Amino acid sequence: ESPTNSVEICPFELNIDFVSNNEWLEFINNDGYNRPELWLSDGWDFIKKYDVKKPLYWLDNKFKFSFFGVERIDGSEPVSHISFYEADAFSRFKKKRLPTEFEIEYFLTQNKKKGNLLENGNFKEISINKQNAMENSYGNLWCWTSSNYLPYSGYKPFSEKLSEYNQKFMCNQFVLKGGSYATPKNHIRSTYRNFYYPSDRWQFSGLRLASDLK
């Protein structure tokens, strides 16, 4: 997260809400997992190799595994446990794009550190009332971004035992922002950079959609 850098952000629009399970079902019902034009080449190879046809932990289009056992999928809740590849394909399906990490960071800095975090005790993603969305900008799910996990300009590794963290991980991974329902409030901040490989699905990940403003 250091050193501090200046980044130019062009005008953009960001959906405050996470993409919902109902929206993901629309993607599935429109044959989204079988349309190569929506997918990055590596993503297409990944879903075909591992027969990915739905979010991780979905049993079918009605039920899923959760911390509480098998549950009926709530269409209003944010879709979770999706890979970067899936998030990217969905954004293309909706004729949108994934936000950059700096767009999400800017969004987070404009809002209080409130949301569905660990202390709330929900232990799951929840639907947010649109009227209170700005008061719930943190937590719920880690938000995929289109940004590669790379060092900031002027970055220098820590010394001694911490020297391996984080530079050795800055290879072929993407940044996620905002925290999740499993993130303690004192652990998250607008600048926090989480990172996973584009095929990873086990983490508490979701997506918001962005677009350019002309």
Each model region followed by its residue ranges:
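Short, polar loop/linker segments at the starts of domains and inter-domain junctions
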Residues: 1-9, 188-198
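Hydrophobic helix-coil surface modules that form long, contiguous segments used
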Residues: 2-15, 21-22, 28-37, 46-49
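Extracellular structured ligand-interaction cores
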Residues: 4, 9-11, 76, 141, ...
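Residues within well-ordered beta-strands of beta-sheet-rich folds
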Residues: 13-15, 93, 208-210
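Functional-site microenvironments in short loops/helix caps that host divalent-cation chemistry
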Residues: 17, 32-190
